[in-house]
């Protein structure tokens, strides 16, 4: 049984870990987000069944003592499932089977955060990708991916749920090939799209004295609709900030 260092957050991180545990896979260490950034963190910790000395925080993964600990644990593969911390090269060199990331985007489109937003705003392909981690952000060789259809009624939230589901399914369907080393490894093209967190803030403010193409404005509003998270907004002349969320429904004939 291969030795797995598991790095996970969010519902996908929980569901993939549950699936691995149900199959009696060998999780030798767990890395979670710090408490203020955790989603499903306590459930992930409980599911791992690991004692506290084998559970680590994402903020320490590139520290020397953590790297020394990983060399002792000897993981053969590192799995990053909706995990938001960047790995140093020294850590990536430890597992013989490499470091894998599950990303809710159809790479090379949607590199970086909020791929659900940018598939709508940029009108680029959406999907799920399982890929190797390299020194770039979501730029490593692709193992496998699947597309997800973006409907005009989708919001940032509904598309995220679809991408989340596709990611979990993609991992389950391909884990055996990864363990056996029979998976494909395809270099990513240099094209595609990449966005930062700051890019989202640039589209969030809708200026009342500017003209927008209707299609673009609708796309921004629906892409940023994901309650209770912040959405697109307007600033009124009296200084009030008003958030805008939309609901789209197909007409019934």
What are these regions (language model features)?
Residues 1-253:
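One-carbon transfer enzymes
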